[in-house]
Amino acid sequence: MLKNRYLKYLFILILLSILSIMPIFAIIYRIFSRNYLYAFIIVCLFFQILAHIKFFLNLDFSLEQRWKLISVIFSLVVGLIILLGSIWVIKNLNNNLCIM
């Protein structure tokens, strides 16, 4: 049982390492054009987030875990709103205060 658990964590470590290294090599060797590169990085990021939620936070879609999953999703949405709002404010400040 204990050995099986360690093998699972080792597999997840290798999987997440590959998902981290793939975008770096895609940038260095210019495998994709710029738009496809952004999409590739976002897809790798999405799969990393799902793997962390599933395997390290041990969350799933069962009824017992539903409220924990909802709280994680809510936290991600609030963080995304704060991030995008900050980018929007800084971009508008740059456009409005730019000296021509």
Curated annotation (Swiss-Prot):
<keyword id="KW-1133">Transmembrane helix</keyword>
<comment type="subunit">
    <text>Heterooctamer of two A chains, two B chains, two C chains and two D chains.</text>
</comment>
<dbReference type="GO" id="GO:0009319">
    <property type="term" value="C:cytochrome o ubiquinol oxidase complex"/>
</dbReference>
<dbReference type="GO" id="GO:0019646">
    <property type="term" value="P:aerobic electron transport chain"/>
</dbReference>
<keyword id="KW-0560">Oxidoreductase</keyword>
<keyword id="KW-1003">Cell membrane</keyword>
<feature type="transmembrane region" description="Helical">
    <location>
        <begin position="69"/>
        <end position="90"/>
    </location>
</feature>
<dbReference type="GO" id="GO:0015990">
    <property type="term" value="P:electron transport coupled proton transport"/>
</dbReference>
<feature type="topological domain" description="Cytoplasmic">
    <location>
        <begin position="60"/>
        <end position="68"/>
    </location>
</feature>
<feature type="transmembrane region" description="Helical">
    <location>
        <begin position="10"/>
        <end position="32"/>
    </location>
</feature>
<dbReference type="Pfam" id="PF03626">
    <property type="entry name" value="COX4_pro"/>
</dbReference>
<dbReference type="GO" id="GO:0015078">
    <property type="term" value="F:proton transmembrane transporter activity"/>
</dbReference>
<comment type="similarity">
    <text>Belongs to the cytochrome c oxidase bacterial subunit 4 family.</text>
</comment>
<feature type="topological domain" description="Extracellular">
    <location>
        <begin position="33"/>
        <end position="36"/>
    </location>
</feature>
<dbReference type="GO" id="GO:0009486">
    <property type="term" value="F:cytochrome bo3 ubiquinol oxidase activity"/>
</dbReference>
<dbReference type="InterPro" id="IPR005171">
    <property type="entry name" value="Cyt_c_oxidase_su4_prok"/>
</dbReference>
<keyword id="KW-0813">Transport</keyword>
<feature type="transmembrane region" description="Helical">
    <location>
        <begin position="37"/>
        <end position="59"/>
    </location>
</feature>
<comment type="function">
    <text>Cytochrome bo(3) ubiquinol terminal oxidase is the component of the aerobic respiratory chain of E.coli that predominates when cells are grown at high aeration. Has proton pump activity across the membrane in addition to electron transfer, pumping 2 protons/electron.</text>
</comment>
<keyword id="KW-0249">Electron transport</keyword>
<keyword id="KW-0472">Membrane</keyword>
<protein>
    <recommendedName>
        <fullName>Cytochrome bo(3) ubiquinol oxidase subunit 4</fullName>
    </recommendedName>
</protein>
<dbReference type="GO" id="GO:0005886">
    <property type="term" value="C:plasma membrane"/>
</dbReference>
<keyword id="KW-0812">Transmembrane</keyword>
<feature type="topological domain" description="Extracellular">
    <location>
        <begin position="91"/>
        <end position="100"/>
    </location>
</feature>
<feature type="topological domain" description="Cytoplasmic">
    <location>
        <begin position="1"/>
        <end position="9"/>
    </location>
</feature>
<dbReference type="InterPro" id="IPR050968">
    <property type="entry name" value="Cytochrome_c_oxidase_bac_sub4"/>
</dbReference>
